[in-house]
Swiss-Prot record:
Its main location: nucleus. PROSITE patterns: GRH_CP2_DB. Functions as a transcriptional activator in a promoter context-dependent manner. Modulates the placental expression of CYP11A1. Involved in regulation of the alpha-globin gene in erythroid cells. Activation of the alpha-globin promoter in erythroid cells is via synergistic interaction with TFCP2. Involved in regulation of the alpha-globin gene in erythroid cells. Binds strongly to sequences around the HIV-1 initiation site and weakly over the TATA-box. Represses HIV-1 transcription by inhibiting the binding of TFIID to the TATA-box. It comes from the Eukaryota. Belongs to the grh/CP2 family. CP2 subfamily. It holds the Pfam family CP2. Residues 320-368 have a biased composition (Polar residues). It is found in: Nucleus. Residues 60-296 form the Grh/CP2 DB domain. This is Upstream-binding protein 1. One of its GO terms (cellular component) is nucleus. The modification Phosphoserine is found at residues 22, 390, 393.
Length: 540
């Protein structure tokens, strides 16, 4: 019996030893020498880095940092850009911080830099029409600015400038070595730029963008150093506080698992450094692209915004100049310009004194050069589009359709430019046709007969009528246009009469002119006045 128990112990001991030996080999091939978790994470399937980002060894350090003292929204998902709500007209501090490492950019040590703060559109589809959007806002809010600088509250800023032609930008100089804070006020609200305004619309987002420049060798602040921006929405006074509270209450109702997908609300908003790329295409290239496809994809602007593109400054700053409006550019041409200012004495916008059309003088010709096209734009009050059409000749401009011009210039200016290109005049309120009889030197008599024929005079020659276009339906306008068309000195015309029944003469009054039928035909003659050296005109 003892032998049997001993054999059982030996067998059990052997089994345990064999089992331990078999377990000891598991995982040996997965040791540190053969397997590394970092190598697995480096595989392409796990790697989702943006190829445009710098590698760890060459991480760029931004020279400046801008912090806006306004809380971010808690209703923004983790990987989305922060969103900050602002109240219209309220002052918000932007702290301008020197973030350079020791030895970085020694050329600006002890020197001032210039920063331009702007409010721009976040959506690229609105950026394409930014000029027209801002012009429309200016029209509805005359005398107001989209962005202002609260100078009394600001600290460390020097020589602030605002240009009347750039209502969405302010600029100033500052010393990076000193404490600097700029207080800004945004006066436009997000719902002012929504296409349909019936109440309850979702307002469009804006961006607060800061661009900083240093001096070049000529002392001009043109060398770009840094740009950063953040996304905002602007509400009517106290509206931002209510929206922030609403977002916070919505987040409190979410489960803990859902909250993990959202960013926390931060007390301040850090403007994110962004790369510069041309967010607004060259106008010509853009129009050429639109010729085959008129609309942009619905997510086009949003996808670009998420990638972190930065809007270029309006005009590359060339010098730190005062904010007085710059004079309109002038152009010289070796040839005589094909455009001319309309004659103020013409009987209609398209007619000279003799009735000949002067359309050829006003209308831009297909052969017009680029310089002549620029002159034509200036003379026809399209100076704000001279830069947009800087490479357009007369033929290029005339090829644009009405729809093209409306998309480029907006509805109001687009239609006006189209009408100017097609030389469309204002439709006259009244048109009459007048033919002159042989002048008579007899004294005004009570009985005069009308011409025997409406188409021929006594010699059988056909009557030739001239068109008189009346923009004002008054008697003095009739006298002025008759004098202009038939080369009669206006001061010599005493009265204008209309021959009535039985040959009586009726004084032409404003009320009579207003009752003229459109395209009426008249013969007229002149007789000497009895009491002066003037003449009377008789319409028959």
């Amino acid at each position: 019996m003892a032998w049997v128990l001993k054999m059982d112990e030996v067998i059990e001991s052997g089994l345990v030893h064999d089992f331990d030996a078999s377990l000891s080999g598991i995982g040996q091939e997965l040791g540190a020498g053969a397997y590394s978790m970092s190598d697995v994470l480096a595989l392409p399937i796990f790697k989702q880095e943006d190829s445009s980002l710098p590698l760890d060894g060459e991480t760029e350090h931004p020279p400046f940092q801008y912090v806006m003292c306004a809380a971010t929204s808690p209703a923004v998902k983790l990987h989305d850009e922060t969103l900050t709500y602002l109240n219209q007209g309220q002052s918000y501090e932007i702290r301008m911080l020197d973030n350079r490492k020791m030895g970085d950019m020694p050329e600006i040590n002890g020197k001032l830099v210039k920063s331009i703060i702007r409010v721009v559109f976040h959506d690229r589809r609105l950026q394409y029409t930014e000029h027209q959007q801002l012009e429309g806002w200016k029209w509805n809010r005359p005398g107001d600015r989209l962005l202002d600088l609260d100078i009394p509250m600001s600290v460390g800023i020097i020589d602030t400038r605002t240009n009347p032609s750039q209502l969405n930008a302010v600029e100033f100089l500052w010393d990076p070595a000193k404490r600097t804070s700029a207080f800004i006020q945004v006066h436009c609200i997000s719902t002012e730029f929504t296409p349909r305004k019936h109440g309850g619309e979702k307002g469009v987002p804006f961006r607060i963008q800061v661009d900083t420049f240093k001096q070049n060798e000529n002392g001009e602040y043109t060398d770009h150093l840094h740009s950063a921006s953040c996304q905002i929405k602007v509400f009517k006074p106290k509206g931002a506080d209510r929206k922030q509270k609403t977002d916070r209450e919505k987040m409190e109702k979410r489960t803990a698992h859902e909250k993990e997908k959202y960013q926390p609300s931060y007390d301040t908003t850090i403007l994110t450094e962004m790369r510069l790329e041309p967010i607004i295409e060259d106008a010509v290239e853009h129009e050429q692209k639109k010729s085959s496809k008129r609309t942009l994809p619905a997510d086009y602007g949003d996808s670009l915004a998420k990638r972190g593109s930065c809007s270029p400054w309006p005009d590359a700053p060339t010098a730190y100049v005062n904010n007085s409006p710059s004079p309109a550019p002038t152009f010289t041409s070796p040839q005589q310009s094909t455009c001319s200012v309309p004659d103020s004495n013409s009987s209609s916008p398209n007619h000279q004194g003799d009735g000949a059309s002067q359309t050829s003088g006003e209308q831009i010709q297909p052969s017009a050069t680029i310089q002549e096209t620029q002159q034509w734009l200036l003379k026809n009050r399209f100076s704000s589009y001279t830069r947009l059409f800087s490479n357009f000749s007369g033929a290029d401009l005339l090829k644009l359709t009405k729809e093209d011009l409306v998309q480029i210039c907006g509805a109001a200016d687009g239609i006006r430019l189209y009408n100017s290109l097609k030389s469309r005049s204002v439709r006259p309120r009244l048109t009459i046709y007048v033919c002159r009889e042989q002048p008579s030197s007899t004294v005004l008599q009570g009985q005069q007969q009308a011409a025997s024929s409406a188409s021929e005079n006594g010699s059988g020659a056909p009557y030739v009528y001239h068109a008189i276009y009346l923009e004002e339906m008054i008697a003095s306008e009739v006298a002025r246009k008759l004098a202009l068309v038939f080369n009669i000195p206006l001061h010599q015309i005493n009265q204008v009469y209309r021959q009535g029944p039985t040959g009586i003469h009726i004084l032409v009054s404003d009320q009579m002119v207003q009752n003229f039928q459109d395209e009426s035909c008249f013969l007229f003659s002149t007789v000497k006045a009895e009491s002066s050296d003037g003449i009377h005109i008789i319409l028959k």
